[in-house]
Amino acid sequence: MNKSVVTNKGTVEGIEKGGYVVFKGIPYAKAPVGELRWKAPQELDAWEGTYKADTFQNMCMQELPKAEHPFMGRFHKEFYNNPEFVPGMGEDCLYLNIWVPEHEEGERLPVAFWIHGGGFGGGYSSELEFDGEAFCKKGVILVTINYRVNIFGFFAHPWLDAENERHISGNYGILDQIAALKWVANNIENFGGDSKNITVFGQSAGSMSTQVLCSSKLTGDIPAKAIMQSGISCDADVLYTPTLKEEEEIGERFIGLTGKTSLEELRAMSTEELFEAKVKLDDEMWKTGRGLVVVPNADGYVLEKTVKDVWKEGTMKDIPYMCGVVTDDLGATPEEVKAGKTGILMEECKRWAATREEKGTPAYLYHFAHELPGDDWGTFHSSELWYTFGTLGRCWRPMEQQDYDLSEEMVTCWTNFMKTGDPNGETQIQEEKEKWESYTKENPYVKIFK
């Protein structure tokens, strides 16, 4: 296996593992610090020599879940309790990681491009539950990325509009994702990947980001397929993309909390000062019942229209899709799903699939209903991630053989879809497995993982 690869900016050297090579912490854009804070990602300068891609780099600035928090404490216990998988933090954070399976020279492997969740306020590319080994065993390259989040990634304000040639602001985190996706499209063939077979997938805010990328003209024809896990917006009010004007109103509130009177003063603020104002803004928004508000916006450029309008017009990318939920996303049991009684997020998935049927491209729907072993929490938001990445061995829970069997089935379905656009693949996992049909009005099939 070749652990040294030449990219368009220089040579990178990864770490050889059993059957694959992992490249950790490859920069895909300049560090967005100083004058580059709240600007679109800037192209890297070329480097000389070999970049040692052997360490996961900084996560982007965020407030990590605390163990004592009444709600987020459960996420700390589940995903953030191992210091080995919690890297440093800083504004210098635009890095990606690549897991490459052993392959023949000249072979072009399918590529999975993962966008983490975290409510557009947190999360990072090297979380405990993310790893590419299981995908590599199936012959798929995995890429995971960092992107700016919270006030660093989605702050919109007229001051920022004024310095932008398109008079827009706020979508820096999405522009990071697009820059990373284009970096992959431009470089992945040197790693053995197929630049024409890239599947964009994500969970929660990462799923919503996937919908944005599939609704934006800036991504062109790069995404060949997409998977949206627990986060899609068609007609309901649960998830939304505000207009630029609406997001600028949030920005005005944030400015008031900082006490600053110019963009220069804002860029001179320390991360600690910015976070203090951000926490105040979050508290204010939650008290008024508005919840998550520092999010991507329809600025007329990154998103010409809101994702809901794009869905209504049917102008999202015309590619195969997979989308689904876990039980606690929607408050419905598997029995209710079979009886046609589903919650909001599953209804959104069905609306999306109906639009795909009209366009003649498939959409595959699923419901993850497996109760995780352990003394708490059941089938919770994000619980499927251990299974889709095949990382059960890292989890604190007393996993049993049925958990490993379910994970094997899900990894196989996900990677089959990434290869061919069909989760069933060329061969079934087991002869007795029921075929996963695409969703149509005549056959509203939802695959249940339990």
Kindly give the residue locations of the regions a language model identified.
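Non-catalytic accessory segments of hydrolases
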Residues: 1-171, 195, 288, 401-410, ...
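A structural signal for well-ordered alpha-helical segments within the folded catalytic domains
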Residues: 21, 91-94, 175-178, 182, ...
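Bulky hydrophobic/aromatic "packing anchor" residues in well-ordered structure
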Residues: 28, 47, 385-387, 447
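Serine-hydrolase-like catalytic core of hydrolytic proteins
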Residues: 79-260, 311-330, 358-361
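Short, solvent-exposed turn/loop segments enriched in Gly/Ser/Thr/Pro and often Arg
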Residues: 148-150, 201-205, 367-375, 429-437
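Substrate-gating cap/lid region and adjacent catalytic-acid/histidine neighborhood
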Residues: 225, 233-240, 257, 261, ...
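Short, flexible loop/turn segments with low-complexity composition
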Residues: 264-269, 426-435
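C-terminal domain-tail junction helix/linker
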Residues: 431-450
